[in-house]
């Protein structure tokens, strides 16, 4: 196993521990807690894949961070902060919406680009809106936390979420996953619209009539993929 992979995991475990302490002391906001829960799942998945104990990894990560801080200067810190862009966190969904349990009568799942797409194919003839929580860097979607599809009465009928045990995903991975989700829901004559944030930061467009965010060419391509899978 690559030593850098182990070191990275150990440091991630310790930094998560520090963030957890902040949360326990009520020193953070809702997006911070949201990322904390997501990263906990990711660390458990990585630990299982690597065969490493989280507690031991956290202690080793503490030693690594302490050694780095001993040699760190204020000037180096200023340079690092100045050269690093600051990602923004976009929240279409409330904590209740993103954490609510939901169930499928006719479940369908697909893995694409490190993302899990889930949808209930029993849903028919509904008006559905897509909402997502994600980070933005350089005015473009960087990391998806969760995307869910809601009916007009608030029921959850589909979801896209990162797979904790797999490496990260790209903006294109998210676009493809949304295309699969839209195609699957439209198969049953549902009407889909995406939130303005999804349209703006995933595709760089604003759809004034609230229609699906996919460009026609890509939407047709995704629909054909879904038809062949169904």
From Swiss-Prot:
Residues 208-230 are annotated as: Disordered. Upon interferon induction, ISGylated via host HERC5; this results in the impairment of NS1 interaction with RNA targets due to its inability to form homodimers and to interact with host EIF2AK2/PKR. It is found in: Host nucleus; Host cytoplasm. Residues 180-215 are annotated as: CPSF4-binding. Keywords: Eukaryotic host gene expression shutoff by virus, Host cytoplasm, Host gene expression shutoff by virus, Host mRNA suppression by virus, Host nucleus, Host-virus interaction, Inhibition of host innate immune response by virus, Inhibition of host interferon signaling pathway by virus, Inhibition of host PKR by virus, Inhibition of host pre-mRNA processing by virus, Inhibition of host RIG-I by virus, Inhibition of host RLR pathway by virus, Interferon antiviral system evasion, RNA-binding, Ubl conjugation, Viral immunoevasion. The keyword RNA-binding applies. GO terms for cellular component: host cell cytoplasm; host cell nucleus. The keyword Lipoprotein does not apply. GO terms for biological process: symbiont-mediated suppression of host cytoplasmic pattern recognition receptor signaling pathway via inhibition of RIG-I activity; symbiont-mediated suppression of host gene expression; symbiont-mediated suppression of host mRNA processing; symbiont-mediated suppression of host PKR/eIFalpha signaling; symbiont-mediated suppression of host type I interferon-mediated signaling pathway. A motif (Nuclear export signal) lies at residues 137-146. Residues 223-230 are annotated as: PABPN1-binding. Gene3D superfamilies: Influenza virus non-structural protein, effector domain, S15/NS1, RNA-binding. Homodimer. Interacts with host TRIM25 (via coiled coil); this interaction specifically inhibits TRIM25 multimerization and TRIM25-mediated RIGI CARD ubiquitination. Interacts with human EIF2AK2/PKR, CPSF4, IVNS1ABP and PABPN1. This is Non-structural protein 1. It comes from Influenza A virus (strain A/Pintail/Alberta/121/1979 H7N8).
């Amino acid at each position: 196993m690559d030593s850098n992979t182990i070191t990275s995991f150990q440091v991630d475990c310790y930094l998560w521990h520090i963030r957890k302490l902040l949360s326990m002391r009520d020193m953070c906001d809702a997006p911070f807690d949201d990322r904390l829960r997501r990263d906990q799942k990711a660390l458990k998945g990585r630990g299982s894949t690597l065969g490493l104990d989280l507690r031991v990894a956290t202690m080793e990560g503490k030693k690594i961070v302490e050694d780095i801080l001993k040699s760190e200067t204020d000037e180096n810190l200023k340079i690092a902060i100045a050269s690093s862009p600051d990602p923004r966190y976009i929240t279409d969904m409330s904590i209740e919406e993103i954490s609510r349990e939901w169930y499928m009568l006719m479940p369908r799942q697909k893995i694409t680009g490190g993302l899990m797409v889930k949808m209930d194919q029993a849903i028919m003839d509904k008006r559905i809106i897509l909402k997502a929580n994600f980070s933005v860097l350089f005015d473009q979607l960087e990391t998806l936390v969760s995307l869910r599809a809601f009916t007009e009465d608030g029921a959850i009928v589909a979801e896209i979420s990162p797979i904790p045990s797999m490496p990260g995903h790209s903006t294109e991975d998210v676009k493809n996953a949304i295309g699969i989700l839209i195609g699957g829901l439209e198969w049953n004559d549902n009407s889909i619209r995406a939130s303005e944030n999804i349209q703006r930061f995933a595709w760089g467009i604003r759809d004034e009539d609230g229609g699906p965010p996919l460009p026609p060419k890509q939407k047709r391509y995704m629909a054909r993929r879904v038809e062949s899978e169904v």
